[in-house]
Amino acid sequence: MSGSGDFIFTRLKLKTKRMRRLDKEITDEKVMDEILLRSDICRLGLVDNDEAYIVPVNYAYENDIIYIHSAHAGKKMELMTQNNKVSFEIELHHEIVKSNIPCGWTAKYRSIMGKGTITIDNDPVAKKKGLDLIMRKYGADMELNYEENSLARMTILMLKIESVTGKQSGNW
């Protein structure tokens, strides 16, 4: 750690600001990896003129890149062509913890938030790789063969993670 409060998340090789609540900060690479690999939903934060726009997506993760399946057109694609800098949030566990005291309720969770740049690679080999990762993540255990016209109708977005922080609450 440097004196500025930064640390390097070594596996991702990302420089990340320390959190205010260090007792809730996740710095363990294995925990961050678990969140990235096991969660089902990634929420993408995009900019729509001067407003925030958030969209939940299915995804897969490999080597600092989040792969996202998408149609060629739609609001998400329109906004990304205007500004390909995005933020994202992924949570793995969440649970409401009740209390007999109204303000004593809390939540137990693990999450990561980050920023990155989205690119589109329309090369059929790149599309197949991204789609294979997504299909395997969600349980496909058969041989994956895609029809050319199916690949032509879809897009694989690649979100290159540039910064990430992890936060948890509750006893893990």
Which ranges hold each PLM region?
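Short beta-strand segments
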Residues: 39-72
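A short mixed-secondary-structure module that forms the rim of ligand-binding clefts
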Residues: 60-95
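Short Pro/Gly-enriched beta-strand edge/turn motifs at strand-loop
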Residues: 38-41, 140-142
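Well-ordered beta-strand positions
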Residues: 45, 58-60, 81, 150, ...
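Charged, gly/pro-rich active-site loop segments
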Residues: 9-23, 93-172
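A generic structural signal for nonpolar/aromatic side chains embedded in well-ordered alpha-helices
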Residues: 35-36, 80, 134
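Extreme N-terminal tail/first-helix region
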Residues: 2-37
